């Protein structure tokens, strides 16, 4: 796998809104690093040249014009690189040929996918191919689901260090989240709803928390679809709109790590609303509203000021032996754009540079990059993983 290539990774979708942010981050962080060779790829060479000029991309950085409707063009791009970083979603509409080409060619792949139906299909379709060729495919390398997947891993490592065993009851609690929701997330949800009309069997995939867990059927999971009072934290909590993908990814990570969290592991994610009547009212409001209704259109996004003023703070609670271990993951920019663009960039670098012993297959972030990626995110990307008690 990964014979001599021109590039460590290619940013596919570099002329889109999120792709430009990835490019901007790479220029800021790695333009003077000769050990990291990357290229920009997209459908229009003139637009690529414009992005390269506006973002001060170092001269000599590759610009690859790729026709997304031409398999030969896609394969030409894949042949030049060790890894494809793609921001072009919804992936069920625009990701099939890219991920298939990577799997068949033994090339690594990272994306921002939060589409469990499509992921389920690709896991079934491409796992054996990826294992044979050595391709490491890692879905969900943005806000869905890195802070949650790695947050649970970070928590379980601390619980196991203290008690010699993991917590089988973990709660993810979003304490703060400021920033515009991703237009790509909204578009992916729309594409999933459309796919359900053509493939009603996807309902079962979306409803099953273990649908990405390689056939494993775990215990009933705690409810997360209506407001509840979390008495251990003394607060009302509301349904969190990203829980349907994050929880599936966390359970997949557990399965891929030989059930490191236990076969009876339970996990849910909810949004902290506060105590008392005000907290209950806020939880009721959130549960009846659509947080994605005002999301930007795909290709659009928030201003630099909005991105830089955004942030998020997620608490993870692991119950064990009548105690509860608390850790947090905090991000320094808006989750859907600023932080996401940094997370996927660091994922590509980590996968190619620090995970050379990882076998081919289809992964989530925790079992593929794990603590190596946690360190990179803390050192470079503005994330903080903290033990709180």
Q: What do the predicted segments below correspond to?
A:
Residues 90-211:
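Glycine-/Pro-rich loop/turn segments that contact NAD(P) or position catalytic residues
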Residues 8, 82-83, 108, 325:
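Structural motif
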Residues 19, 157-389:
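C-terminal catalytic/substrate-binding lobe primarily of soluble NAD(P)-dependent oxidoreductases
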Residues 64-83, 87-94:
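Conserved Rossmann-fold cofactor-binding substructure of NAD(P)-dependent oxidoreductases
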């Amino acid at each position: 796998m990964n014979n001599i290539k021109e590039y460590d990774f290619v940013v596919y979708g570099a002329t889109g809104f999120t792709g430009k942010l990835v490019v901007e981050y790479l220029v800021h962080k790695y333009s003077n690093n000769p050990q990291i060779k990357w290229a920009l790829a997209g459908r229009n060479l003139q637009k690529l040249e414009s992005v390269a000029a506006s973002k001060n991309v170092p001269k000599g950085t590759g610009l690859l014009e790729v026709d997304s409707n031409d398999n030969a063009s896609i394969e030409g791009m894949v042949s030049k690189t060790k890894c494809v970083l793609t921001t072009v979603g919804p992936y069920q509409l625009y990701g099939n040929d890219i991920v298939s080409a990577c799997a068949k060619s033994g090339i690594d792949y990272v994306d921002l996918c939060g589409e469990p139906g499509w992921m389920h299909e690709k896991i079934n379709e491409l796992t054996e191919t990826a294992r044979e060729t050595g391709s490491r495919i890692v879905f969900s390398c943005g806000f869905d689901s890195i802070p949650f997947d790695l947050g649970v891993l970070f928590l379980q490592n601390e619980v196991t260090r203290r008690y010699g065993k993991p917590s089988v009851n973990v709660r993810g609690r979003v304490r703060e989240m400021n920033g515009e929701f991703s237009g790509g997330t909204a578009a992916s949800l729309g594409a999933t709803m459309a796919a359900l009309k053509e493939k009603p069997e996807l309902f079962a995939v979306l409803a099953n928390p273990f649908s990405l867990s390689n056939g494993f059927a775990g215990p009933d999971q705690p409810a997360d679809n209506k407001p509840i009072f979390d008495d251990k934290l003394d607060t009302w909590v509301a349904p969190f709109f990203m829980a349907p993908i994050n929880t599936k990814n966390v359970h997949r990570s557990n399965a891929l790590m030989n059930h490191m969290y236990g076969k009876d592991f339970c996990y849910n994610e909810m949004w902290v609303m506060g105590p008392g009547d005000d907290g209950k009212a806020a939880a009721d409001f959130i549960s009846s509203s659509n947080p994605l209704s005002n999301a930007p259109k795909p290709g659009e996004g928030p201003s630099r000021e909005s991105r830089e003023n955004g942030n998020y703070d997620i608490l993870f609670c692991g119950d064990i032996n009548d105690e509860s271990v608390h850790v947090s993951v905090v991000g320094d920019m808006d989750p859907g754009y600023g932080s996401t663009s940094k997370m996927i960039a660091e994922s590509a670098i980590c996968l190619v540079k620090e995970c050379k012993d990882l076998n081919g297959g289809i992964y989530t972030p925790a079992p593929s990059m794990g603590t190596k990626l946690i360190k990179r995110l803390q050192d470079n990307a503005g994330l903080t993983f903290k033990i709180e008690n």
